[in-house]
Regions:
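Glycine-rich phosphate/diphosphate-binding loop of Rossmann-like nucleotide-binding domains
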Residues: 2-39
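Residue-level preference for the first positions of well-ordered beta-strands
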Residues: 3, 59-60, 115-116
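C-terminal binding/interaction regions
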Residues: 8-15, 32-34, 91-139
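Short glycine/serine/threonine-rich phosphate/pyrophosphate-binding segments
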Residues: 13-18, 42-45, 67-75, 96-99, ...
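Short, glycine/charged-enriched secondary-structure capping and boundary segments
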Residues: 19-22, 47-49, 75-79, 101-104, ...
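N-terminal beta-loop-helix "entrance" segment that forms/cooperates
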Residues: 31-55
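Glycine-rich phosphate-binding loop
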Residues: 46-91
Length: 139
């Protein structure tokens, strides 16, 4: 039974998931990881988000992307009328690269009534999101 959905914008974001996925495995939390770009594949992304609503056991979504970092905000917009918390992470294009502040600002300045929690960037931000998700799922 999957309680956690993880959506990332590109396969190049995968290196940042290692510590968080390891943490979830230690806590025995099953998750589904989907790669879908809001900019390159908007229809697929929309379909994936709407499909997630069919999973009545879904408790948390973690979403992250690089460059414009639109994915977490799009998900938050679609799911604003649900009780599903969404954690957003900002990924750089590669480990060690500096953060582009404009994209980070996208995550921390959502419109009112469109909740999205920004948990940081890269591997550390993803790990923090996984830790928070585990707390929600285990309660």
């Amino acid at each position: 039974m999957v309680h956690l959905l993880i959506m990332i914008g590109s396969s190049s974001d995968k290196p940042f998931l290692h510590a968080g996925l390891e943490y979830l495995q230690e806590k025995k939390i099953d998750c589904e990881v989907i790669i879908s770009s809001t900019h390159r594949e908007p229809q697929k992304t929309s379909a994936e988000i709407l499909m997630s609503l069919k999973n009545k056991n879904l408790k948390v979504i973690i979403a992250g992307a690089a460059t414009a970092t639109g994915l977490p905000g799009v998900i938050a917009g679609y799911l604003q009328e649900t009780n599903i918390p969404i954690f957003g992470i900002r990924f750089t294009k590669e480990p060690g690269q500096s953060i582009i502040e404009d994209a980070t600002f996208n995550l921390s300045s959502m419109p009112s009534r469109v909740p999205l929690a920004y948990t940081g960037f890269n591997e550390k931000g993803f790990l923090h999101a996984c830790m928070l998700a585990a707390r929600i799922i285990k309660t």
